[in-house]
């Protein structure tokens, strides 16, 4: 949210990316993506400061993706750690598709189409950002012109928060707490979180540095983190009580956010207007980049 005051920011509703992994279930795609935009607005993303747009409404993304695919070696894509991990974890769907293998190329097009100088990412996305830089460098080298800059990563103080089950946080794994989550569901989800595997009995001293529950305290209750860690190491607080306190902290943290979100839900027409205006603005910038690229490739 603070980046809006320092950079010209673009926030993209990645519907094509969503279809790459959920191609068999397009029914709820639109509603889910609009829900994401409402989350952004709720948390402080402002259409007066930033551009919010829908990926599929700016066709230049697809065009640059295709052109990048011509110059991207297969080996670059096959070595992506996220690709290998998701193939292993995908038990109920087939992700061994051309589209899924190539989604980092589309991601590169999403970034380089706007000649982004910086990208806010989590640690798990750093390999993808490096691949984006490699694709940009290769294009610049092949066609003897530095069109694309090397986008730098913007990491937060907590660059990675694991999912409730200790894996990468992902909608695909359903291991997250949504902004719109009801209090009873928050409590149930936190209750099921993985804790210190070495702590079997209450009297066993804990190891908060390896406990996923404790990592959430660092983000949502930093004022309690050190005390909770000390109590855990001395076996003066059990995992159940630790989870209960965290759950109530999250419920309280989300309460005003959910109130604001419910107000935004009442005016979905306004959300679509914001996205329509943003998509037009993004399209104008994207067309300039594509025109430049086509000139280098003798496609005009």
Where are each of the predicted segments found?
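Conserved nucleotide- and phosphate/pyrophosphate-binding catalytic cores
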Residues: 127, 133-300
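A short secondary-structure junction signal
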Residues: 79-81, 116-117, 125, 172-173
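Extended aliphatic helical segments
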Residues: 1, 13, 37, 58, ...
